[in-house]
Structures are given as structure tokens and as C-alpha cells.
Regions:
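N-terminal strand-loop element at the rim of the active site
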Residues: 6-13, 19-64
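Short glycine-rich, flexible loops that bind phosphorylated cofactors or substrates
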Residues: 62-63, 93-94, 111
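A structural micro-motif
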Residues: 31, 52, 82-83, 100-101
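Catalytic nucleophile loop
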Residues: 20, 92-93
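Active-site proximal beta-strand in glycosyltransferases
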Residues: 2, 84-86, 97-111
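Short, well-structured alpha-helical segments in soluble
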Residues: 70-81
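Short, Lys/Arg-enriched, disordered terminal segments
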Residues: 1, 29, 80-81
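Short His-centered aromatic/hydrophobic patch
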Residues: 86-92
């Protein structure tokens, strides 16, 4: 299983959103994919039409960060079949406790 951690995912519009969605769709051809993404307006219409699991996390930004990392860490603890964690930003990984392989995408002004 691949675990995708992102703050940027459709139906929100943008380049990194398209990249994360395309990457997720491609990875579903290789293995099961689970996505943890931020809540976005109209997400229900989008989420019901994909062939992978998406868990949306909402709330105020600061609280969402801690709540989302808690949910991800619990998921990792209870799902030993995760092979790799892929994140769209270092901030998506900073509170994640795992010894699984981690891939962090770098884009825009982060370098």
C-alpha cells in the first residue's frame, strides 16, 4: 500500500493538485493507495468518483495539522502493509512517526 499525504488535492484547482492526483491515479495501477488530504469545498462529489480511499481532514489550520498527523500515525500503527509514504511538502511529514520509506516532493519556492 502507498500512503499519500497532501494539503493540495482536487477538487481544489492548481498545479500541485493535478500532480498529486495524477501520481495517485498512476500508483493505483501498482498497489492500493490511501490518501490523507485537507478538506475542500465540494470534495464529496470528487471523492465518490475515484478508485482509491481518501480521508479528508478539516478544521482550523493549526488544529488540522495536529489532528491530521494523529490520524496518519494511528493509521500507520494499525496498517503494517504500508510500503511507502509520499508527501507533497515537508510540512506534511514533519509530525509523522514511521520507519517506512518516505518520499517528499519539492516544488515552487521550497528550494
Amino acid at each position: 500500500m502507498f500512503l499519500i499525504l497532501t494539503r493540495n488535492f482536487p477538487p481544489e484547482i492548481g498545479g500541485i493538485q493535478n500532480l498529486m492526483h495524477g501520481l495517485t491515479k498512476s500508483l493505483t495501477k501498482l498497489n492500493i493507495v490511501k490518501v490523507f488530504a485537507d478538506y475542500h469545498k465540494n470534495y464529496l462529489d470528487f471523492d465518490k468518483n475515484v478508485n482509491f480511499s481518501i480521508e479528508r481532514v478539516g478544521g482550523p489550520k493549526l488544529l488540522r495539522k495536529y489532528r491530521k498527523s494523529y490520524l496518519i500515525n494511528e493509521f500507520l500503527k494499525n496498517n503494517r502493509n504500508v510500503e511507502c509514504v509520499i508527501a507533497d511538502h515537508w510540512k506534511s511529514l514533519e509530525l509523522i512517526n514511521t520507519n517506512k520509506k518516505r518520499i517528499c516532493l519539492i516544488h515552487s519556492k521550497e528550494i
